[in-house]
Swiss-Prot record:
InterPro entries: Ribosomal_uL29, Ribosomal_uL29_sf
Keyword Transferase in annotation: no
Cystine connections: none
Organism: Treponema pallidum (strain Nichols)
Family: Belongs to the universal ribosomal protein uL29 family.
UniProt-listed Pfam families: Ribosomal_L29 (PF00831)
Source superkingdom: Bacteria
Lineage, highest ranks first: Bacteria, Pseudomonadati, Spirochaetota, Spirochaetia, Spirochaetales
Name this protein carries in UniProt: Large ribosomal subunit protein uL29
Single GO MF annotation: structural constituent of ribosome
BP-aspect Gene Ontology terms: translation
Amino acid sequence: MGRGGCAQLSYSELLSRRRELERKYLDLRFQLVVEHVDNKLMKRILRRQIAAVNTFLRHKELTELEKRGVRE
């Protein structure tokens, strides 16, 4: 799923996606320690995907606060 696909997900779907990516990232880190991994760049790719999801989550949080008239 590209970054554009994340923008259309709901807040709960984004949280679920982040948990899924974090689980994959931890599994990959374990595999890197225990055995050989074919695509070592996958670790960087997963970190960037997690960062993108976090960005969309924060944007949705700020948008919701703005709708309520709350300022940080």
